[in-house]
Amino acid sequence: MLFEMDRLSEQDTYKLLVSTVVPRPIAWVVTQDPDGAINAAPYSFFNAVSGNPPIVTFGIGGRGAGDAKDTGNNIRRTGQFVVNLVNNATAEAMNITAIDFPHSVDELQEAGLSFTPSSNSLLDAERLLNSSRYSAPC
């Protein structure tokens, strides 16, 4: 079947893409702003793209009005983030962190999550304590 992508709505294009690439790993990205506020947000446009050097990628879309998301702003300002993988036990909390809260709202608190400082002393971003077994400081 041939899809003329330029004729599809943005929503239909998204649905086509997300139903084509399966299974879909979700990067649960934790960042910290320069003032120390922690942000957690899930990204389903995520994958590993290289083993040597180890590289992961995820796509950060914008907000409806063209505003940048906190995750992107924090990464640009600090250069640091931690990728956690979502598992079945944390799926509900992940959905809560997907809500478009105002910047002042602590997603971790809303989702009942806790965090621990990264084991990499050069990295200030946090990893989720009750996430999956995989956390990658970047």
Description of each model-found segment:
Residues 1-39, 47-138:
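Active-site-proximal mixed secondary-structure blocks
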